[in-house]
């Protein structure tokens, strides 16, 4: 039986931000979301989020059926925070205590920690640091048993030489917390109720202290300022890149790749430099992505080529497509096999069938385009009258001449041709030619104006 507490009430003054610290992102999602996701992997039956500063924002962002919020109205220390959760803890449960600003602890590490808890033993996660300044020190007796945790500001000169520090993450029986937390005092340099003071109480009550350590220091690093956030972001991205390369993805420079979501990739995928993946992205076999592309919540089919500087969001792209460079595919774009979307083309809510081409300088929005269609350079679907959006339908094998404006709602039939420079306001039937432009006049003898000297 496992209850998991996540402390997320702090202000984060050193972030110098109006956003609560735990909502600042790593890898495209809030710090506390990483912790909640890991808690779910560990498998607690009850998940309690202790909120305080910016509670409404945190609750709004983190609301979920399995998350219960507990308010810490005054932030009087970690012990005080856990005290607020006491009425919600199940007496027979093991309690795992985590921190909303420590995002990268692995579930496997926490599962080992929880496994170390018995009726007469609690568990601490500690780590050895080359420079432990500012952290609470793990004090051991001559037998090596943990006897206390001393905060840096309260530590003696001898204790400050200790390199093993408290990460704050611990697991303990709920009934022990119910005995110990009401006895906490705030007679310390900070005037706060330290959760770490329960270690001395455990020792006095004959409860042993089991210690686990993480596989990497970064698992237990917290974020208090922007520099720490940036440092941990780089570590997170390195881990993401390694996992992708282990799965067979070619990253031409792993240090210049960002995954801010979840990427699923097929075989022989190649991603060039400065590409950003956000949200849920699926890449088929043989996909090539050139430099400086952004792909958000999209699915890209086998052997599709995304050329440089393209921006793709909430789109579905089938196999053997050719996109960009400098293409923008907006939400609702759905491309069938072998579609070509060229440079400076924008699509939105556009369904384009197999083999069609929109190669240059065009806008296709609220449109359904058939197969084998050629859309000439500079063509736009005029889909908005200032209030409402209207749809354009283009049939199979139609040809739209360059610099045409298709004023929706309008239907271009299969095999129809629209002459270059036309403004089409009425339907064009199948196989018809539509030309809608002013008649050309050539004026003989005309002289260009000249400047007066």
From Swiss-Prot:
Residues 248-453 are annotated as: N-acetyltransferase. Residues 227-247 are annotated as: Linker. Binds 1 Mg(2+) ion per subunit. It holds the Pfam family Hexapep_2. GO terms for biological process: cell morphogenesis; cell wall organization; lipid A biosynthetic process; peptidoglycan biosynthetic process; regulation of cell shape; UDP-N-acetylglucosamine biosynthetic process. Its main location: cytoplasm. Its EC number is 2.7.7.23, 2.3.1.157. UDP-N-acetyl-alpha-D-glucosamine binds at residues 7-10, 21, 72, 77-78, 99-101, 136, 151, 166, 224, 330, 348, 363, 374. One of its GO terms (cellular component) is cytoplasm. Coiled coil: none annotated. One of its GO terms (molecular function) is UDP-N-acetylglucosamine diphosphorylase activity. PROSITE patterns: HEXAPEP_TRANSFERASES. CDD domains: GT2_GlmU_N_bac (cd02540), LbH_GlmU_C (cd03353). Homotrimer. This is Bifunctional protein GlmU. It comes from Cellvibrio japonicus (strain Ueda107). The gene is glmU.
